[in-house]
Amino acid sequence: MEFSTKTEILQEQQAGAQLFVCTEEAQLNHPTALALLSSLEEGQNFADTKIPTGNGLQAVAVCCLKSTGRAALNKAAAEAAKWAQNQETVNVDVHAFEEAQAAAVAEAFAIAFGNAAYRFDRYKKEAKPAKFAEAVFHSAHEAAVKEALRVAEAQVYGQSLCRDLGNAAPNECTPEFLARTAKAEAEKLGAHAKIIEKDYIKENMGSFWSVAKGSVEDPYLVELSYFGAADKEAAPVVLVGKGITFDTGGISLKPGLNMDEMKFDMCGAATVISTFCAAVKLQLPINLIAVVATCENMPSGAANKPGDVVKSMKGLTIEVLNTDAEGRLILCDALTYAEQFKPKAVIDVATLTGACIVALGHDVSGVMGNNQDLVDSLLAASYNVDDKAWQLPLFETYKDQLKSNFADIPNIGTPGAGTITAATFLSYFTEGYPWAHLDIAGTAWKSGAEKGATGRPVPLLLNYLRNL
């Protein structure tokens, strides 16, 4: 998908499909668009038609915005994107808006167009590429719109990378594949990448290794780094991602129904890799590090057993009461590893608990943390781009649900508040820095007819990083 800008006002008979984005009060200098705007009934905000030209029929559409809030923008843009899929090139006129609004409209519509054009068909014999290939935005505020399109392009790139990684089959997207892809993508953008292999993990990260040793696939720890701040020594933001490339549940085996979707259990890692790369693509003036722990969770003679006690990198011992609560076992060591960077903030991202879906459904990510300013910044970013998230509490009393007779802590709590007790477990390993946890179990992918990775919460995290 290509985006570009022009300052000219669209006229009748001009080549290419035409989309006018405006308000109800807009004075459109285009008879067909004006007629479409006048035809909108109560509750409608989109109308389209085709008009004859010397080269055949031309598609013309109007999208009338009742609000320029991001949620309303995203909804309107998604509707327009469905129409745009049938065009090759769409000219989008946003002359009805002043500079800031024109930029916001262009960004939202470009992101919707880019995401709608996404295809994942590399395993199919006959691929069907998207017809829609180019969007040209027309505005008097060309510089502001051009910058908005630069941001949109980076977000679409990040979400598409995240979706590609999530959608990849688990026999292709092994821990090694995920690690090598992260390294290659980061280095292509000029960032530094380091892959840490099995021997280090086995020797230093006992909790992580306890999960990984059940699989024939080796585990990897990936470290990506980018120093874009004027002060290269300034404390970085560290993103930490859970990369379980397939989760059977281990000895505590999951039910067979829908187990194929457990290839998406690495979407936290995919989000972290993709957000990092999008931030580097934008050349944000920040110092940023991404840490990804990746392995499989498989049942075997070498796998964790319920009742096993393992020692974390921090030194705390963990009683494994359920081998299907493995994400926190690899994350806790990755979070301890992050301490060495003396971070400004650490944000971990994980498809951690089914309980989060019970609490918040499939449209809202859960946010928890030990620093309210950091949590508030993430919630603000969520609102800015309409990538919904909601804070859950982390009261000290939840630690009462994490008691073990045989180790320092168990890997699951007593029944109730499963999302919170999982985050409470992680909080034992994040005492040395400001930390927030994003549980994306409900938002990272869709099931059913639209099955596939969503690329969320890349929009939220990228907006957070842009506003540092």
From Swiss-Prot:
Its EC number is 3.4.11.1, 3.4.11.10. It is found in: Cytoplasm. Keywords: Aminopeptidase, Cytoplasm, Hydrolase, Manganese, Metal-binding, Protease. Binds 2 manganese ions per subunit. Its main location: cytoplasm. Transmembrane segments: none annotated. GO terms for molecular function: manganese ion binding; metalloaminopeptidase activity. The active site is at K254, R328. Its cofactor is Mn(2+). Signal peptide: none annotated. One of its GO terms (cellular component) is cytoplasm. Presumably involved in the processing and regular turnover of intracellular proteins. Catalyzes the removal of unsubstituted N-terminal amino acids from various peptides. This is Probable cytosol aminopeptidase. The gene is pepA.
